């Protein structure tokens, strides 16, 4: 999972189109949320919803700015990416070819106790955050529907 995040961040350096950059940012956020779900499901869910809302607004804005641009892939720039990815795998995980159950990785059943360790104070904060984000979503929808024009013309 960490290797996929490193690979996506390497490819983000080579992207020259904003929509491809937005898509890779979305995939990277999704992978980080999947990694965080083992620690706390609520934090990963809230992080995903916040990033998804921001990325969707950014996607609408960027797609209205660059509607007819084509993707241009430069294959020569990928020649240095492959050795960098292999080296990053070797540095981040010295035994990435030899994964075994005795390598010290935690299984999802080890995190059951952590997931249920939510007290009433943090649940109240999560509830307020969810209500606040929902109200912000409703306000943005109402603002966009009241003008009945594209997002680009508002700027």
Swiss-Prot record:
The keyword Protein biosynthesis does not apply. It is a multi-pass membrane protein. It is found in: Mitochondrion membrane. The keyword Protease does not apply. One of its GO terms (molecular function) is NADH dehydrogenase (ubiquinone) activity. Keywords: Electron transport, Membrane, Mitochondrion, NAD, Respiratory chain, Translocase, Transmembrane, Transmembrane helix, Transport, Ubiquinone. GO terms for cellular component: mitochondrial membrane. It catalyses: a ubiquinone + NADH + 5 H(+)(in) = a ubiquinol + NAD(+) + 4 H(+)(out). Its EC number is 7.1.1.2. It is an enzyme of class 7 (translocase). The chain crosses the membrane at residues 1-21, 42-62, 71-91, 121-141. Core subunit of the mitochondrial membrane respiratory chain NADH dehydrogenase (Complex I) that is believed to belong to the minimal assembly required for catalysis. Complex I functions in the transfer of electrons from NADH to the respiratory chain. The immediate electron acceptor for the enzyme is believed to be ubiquinone. Belongs to the complex I subunit 6 family. This is NADH-ubiquinone oxidoreductase chain 6. It comes from Artemia franciscana. The gene is ND6.
């Amino acid at each position: 999972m960490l290797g996929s995040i490193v690979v996506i961040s390497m490819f983000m350096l080579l992207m020259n189109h904003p929509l491809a950059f937005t898509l890779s940012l979305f995939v990277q956020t999704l992978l980080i949320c999947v990694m965080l779900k083992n620690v706390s499901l609520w934090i990963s869910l809230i992080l995903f919803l916040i990033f998804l809302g921001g990325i969707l607004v950014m996607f609408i804005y960027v797609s209205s700015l660059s509607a007819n641009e084509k993707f241009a892939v430069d294959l020569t720039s990928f020649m240095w990416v492959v050795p960098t990815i292999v080296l990053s795998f070797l540095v981040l995980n010295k035994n990435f070819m030899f994964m075994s159950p005795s390598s010290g990785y935690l299984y999802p059943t080890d995190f059951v106790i952590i997931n249920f360790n939510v007290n009433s104070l943090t649940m109240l904060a999560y509830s307020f955050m969810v209500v606040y984000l929902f109200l912000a979503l409703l306000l943005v929808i109402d603002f966009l529907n009241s003008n009945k024009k594209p997002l680009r013309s508002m700027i």
